[in-house]
Amino acid sequence: MVLLPWELEEDILSRLPPRSLVQFRSVCKRWNALFDVKSFNKDQFARARPQFIFITDSKIYSIEIIGLDGVDPTIKLHVLDSSGIPYREWKFAYLTITACDGRWIKWIEYENKGFNVCGVGYDNTRPEKVYKILEYLECRREESSNACYQRVAIYECASHAFKFIDTSNKVWFISDVQRYSVCLNGNLYWLSFDDFRILCFDFSREIVKPFCLLPCRKFDKCDLLALQVFKGDRLSLLNQCCKTRTIEIWVTKKKIDSSNNNGSDEVVWISLLTLPPNNLPNLFIVCYGISYFIYDKTTLIIYCEDENTSAACIYIIRGDLFKKFEIDSSAFFCYHCVYAPNFIPLPLM
């Protein structure tokens, strides 16, 4: 039997989907050891295709998009085991999910703590990624009063260190971060609708700073705007016109990293995709927001609720192709985000 060079063998394995790859852990010790090799995990993660995580009050789904290169793409639902997840015993309203560099993260807080998670990031100036959680706490002004104010805090996952940071409510609204933020290269980015900008929370300096103006300078305040990560290193912005339902996708021309996210350089945006209103869902009336990603610069895959039935749906839209898949018509509450399957451990507790 002719043995393949180990480098080629490793490269082949890194191209397999995580769900398939995990089945090979028991083949031999050398293959099993690969899961602890950082370079292998990094290569595998870079090739991973985005998926959706969808959480209802009774189930957790991983939603895989299949056959995007063909003429008849479809979806595959994986119901994840949630028997050991304690959130089912608590109020569903106190659960938040988000993604950091495409990695799905679930954060749960007890009701009496009153913490609200905004997002997860890390100091991108350090050689090792030390993950941090940005959150805010509702504090009562007086013990006998219901009047509250917000204090912003950072929790460092590895050391369990917790500290409050000074912020100004005149500069940013923390609730916008919680609802609209995405993580790219360790920093959080979100839409500021009051001044038509994208703001950034820099975890290395622990400050909020302006990033850039929105590319669609002229839009109705009723339009739907949604920010996402594009190709793992850029930002994308979805804009649906409230009058015509036309969807336009913008992406940043250059990669976003520590050299060009200081707010002083002009960020160049490119209009990547425009979709006519035929059959497009009405995104600006959804209750639980939208999640989306772009495949091969031509296809929009989007999660939102059906405007008539409120059922959770996945839409695949490309040129003349329009496909709609209903996921769960019984979900009363739901949370969702885009993530990329991977084997990279994330120490959160």
Swiss-Prot record:
Stored CDD domains: F-box_AtFBW1-like
Signal peptide: none
Xref: SMART domains: FBOX (SM00256)
Keyword set, alphabetical order: Leucine-rich repeat
Organism taxonomic ancestry: Eukaryota, Viridiplantae, Streptophyta, Embryophyta, Tracheophyta
LRR repeats: 267-290
Protein name per the record: Putative F-box/LRR-repeat protein At3g16555
PANTHER family, alphabetized: F-BOX ONLY PROTEIN 10-RELATED, OS09G0372900 PROTEIN-RELATED
InterPro entries: A_thaliana_F-box (IPR050233), F-box-assoc_dom_typ1 (IPR006527), F-box-assoc_interact_dom (IPR017451), F-box-like_dom_sf (IPR036047), F-box_dom (IPR001810)
Organism: Arabidopsis thaliana
Source domain of life: Eukaryota
Residue stretches making up the F-box domain: 1-48
Keyword 4Fe-4S: no
Pfam families: F-box, FBA_1
